[in-house]
Every structure is written in C-alpha cells, then in structure tokens.
C-alpha cells in the first residue's frame, strides 16, 4: 500500500544520526539545518519523473532497476561498476560510519553500554534482520517503527517544552524562540544574529560560513536530487511490486507513497531539531550541563 511506501521512504532516511546529530545541531545552531528537511518536495520528482522511467526499464530488463544497472544498459558495464564502487565507498564513509557512531553514543548515554558494543551491535543486528527478512521484512519494520518514532519524538518535544515553560507548552515555545533569537549565534561585535531562522545573509554573522544565505538551499537541492531520485536505498522502496502487476497500478501507488513521504520529511524539524533547541534553552537555565551538544536529544 502507498502508506507503507511512504513510511518506508521516511524510515530509510531516518537514523541515529538524526537523533544525535540533528538535535545536537539544533542545540548549537538553531534551525539553520532545517533546510535539509525542507527538501521533501524532491520526493515528488521521484514519483512523477523517475518512477515512470525506472518502471519502463523494469519492464524492458525484467528486474528491479538500480542506477548502476541503467548506466550499464545505457553506456558500458564498466560505467555501472564504477558507480557501484563509488556509492559503496561513500555509504561506508558518510552513512554507515556516522550511523554506527551516533548509535553508539545514543546507546551509551541511554543504556550505559560501552560505545563500541553499541556501535558494532547495531551494525550486526541490522545486517541479520536485513538478510533474514529481506525487503519485505524491511518494509514491514518501517511501517511499524515510523508511527512509534513520530509519536515518541513528539512526546519528547512536548515534555521538553512543558519543562521549559513551567508546565505550559506554549510558554515553553515562546521561551525557546526567545533564547534562539537573543542568546544563540552572538557575533564578535556582541550583536545577536539569532538562530531562529534558516538563512544567514551577512558575512559578520558567525553562522554565515556554515549556512551562506540562499546558496545553502541551492546546495541542499542538488544533493537532495541525487539522494531522493537516484539513491537505490530510497528507490527500491518505491518500486516494490508483485510479478505481473500493471504499470499504472505500480506508478499510482508509488506517487501516493511519494506524497506521503514528502509530508513525513517535514516532521524531523519538530521531532529532532527543535528538541535540541529546547535542550539548549533548558541548559541555559541551569537545568543540566550540556557541554556535549550530541547528547541534546537524550537529555
């Protein structure tokens, strides 16, 4: 069903790096990192432009197509193999390693497990489940964990806002935004440039180097296009189908799932980023020590 596809795309994108990294960035830089989560509209390009293309090749080649398969078909065997190698190396260095690291930190803080036990255990358990359960198992787990993740994260957000506002969520929101506006991102000139907005336009703004005006949105769009429309980790969740299923049925389901995933993609701003900002505001009031912003979501 389309809602399973939407949940699977969303769950494929969410990992421990969001719980640790996105919340930590929120505690340090406010909503500057939210521009990555605003790229959900790219998933619509996957559903409307790329799924028909992939499905056409599926019918022609008789199997689920990956981008390396397409390059082998369109150009040469070597071209597709090189993309596979580059993608594998990139995933190990930028995705798997980061997920293992942040997962180890989170489990160490939450359960008291030694860092390496948590990091390696996370990789081993994920591998076992994927090998034994296959794509069907992954999709089923995604459908189960997505609502749990959303409900649990919003519960953390509301409890944090209530703690900040002395029992009032609305007061907590006001205090959090005021802290982001006046106490975060203070320049060398003593001026508070604020961390309650995504774009930083002036070079005197300390966060300009990390979030240089509108260019950061352009850069995120280019990377988002690659990730959401060509990355096999995402694409394979859209193209799941029964043997002999009609093209229009596959594409209609994929497009509906893409729409659902696009809406889901906005949620991490509220699920992870803003709880980090709440943690920073609570730490400023002396509620706890947060010298390590990576622990923002856990605390």
Located regions from the model:
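Membrane-interface helix-loop-helix modules in multi-pass membrane proteins
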Residues: 2-63, 208-227, 231-239, 244-287, ...
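Interfacial loop/helix-cap signal at membrane boundaries in integral membrane proteins
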Residues: 3, 7, 182-208, 292-298
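Small-residue-rich segments of transmembrane alpha-helices in multi-pass membrane proteins
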Residues: 3-8, 73-77, 81, 145-159
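Transmembrane alpha-helical core residues of multi-pass small-molecule transporters
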Residues: 11, 39-43, 87, 122-125, ...
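Helix-loop-helix module between adjacent transmembrane segments
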Residues: 34-131, 219-227
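Hydrophobic alpha-helical segments and their helix-loop junctions in multi-pass secondary transporters
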Residues: 51, 92, 96, 100, ...
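Helix-boundary and loop/linker segments of multi-pass membrane transporters
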Residues: 72-77, 112, 202-210, 247-250, ...
């Amino acid at each position: 069903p389309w809602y399973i596809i939407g949940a699977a795309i969303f769950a494929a994108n969410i990992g421990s790096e969001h719980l640790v990294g996105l919340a930590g960035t929120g505690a340090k830089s406010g909503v500057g990192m939210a521009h990555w989560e605003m790229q959900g509209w790219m998933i619509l390009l996957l559903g409307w432009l790329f799924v028909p293309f992939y499905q056409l090749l599926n019918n022609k080649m008789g199997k689920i197509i990956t981008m390396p398969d397409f390059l082998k078909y369109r150009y040469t065997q070597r071209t597709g193999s090189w993309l596979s190698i580059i993608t594998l190396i990139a995933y190990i260095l930028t995705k798997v390693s980061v997920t293992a690291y942040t997962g180890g930190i989170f489990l160490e803080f939450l359960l008291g497990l030694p860092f390496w036990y948590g990091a390696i255990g996370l990789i081993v358990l994920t591998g076992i489940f994927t090998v034994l359960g296959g794509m069907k198992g992954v999709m089923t787990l995604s459908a189960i964990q997505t609502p749990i993740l959303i409900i649990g994260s919003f519960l953390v957000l509301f409890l944090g806002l209530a703690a900040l506002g002395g029992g009032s969520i609305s007061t907590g929101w006001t205090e959090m935004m005021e802290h982001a506006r006046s106490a975060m991102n203070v320049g060398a000139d003593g001026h508070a440039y604020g961390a309650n907005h995504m774009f930083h336009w002036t070079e005197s703004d300390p966060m300009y180097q990390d979030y240089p005006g509108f260019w950061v949105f352009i850069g995120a769009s280019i990377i988002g296009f690659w990730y959401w429309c060509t990355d096999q980790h995402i694409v394979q969740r859209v193209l799941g189908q029964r043997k002999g299923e009609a093209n229009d049925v596959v594409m209609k389901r994929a497009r509906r799932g893409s729409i659902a995933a696009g809406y889901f993609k906005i949620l991490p701003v509220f699920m992870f980023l803003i709880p980090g900002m709440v943690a920073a505001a609570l730490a400023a009031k002396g509620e706890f020590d947060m010298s390590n912003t990576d622990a923002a979501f856990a605390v």
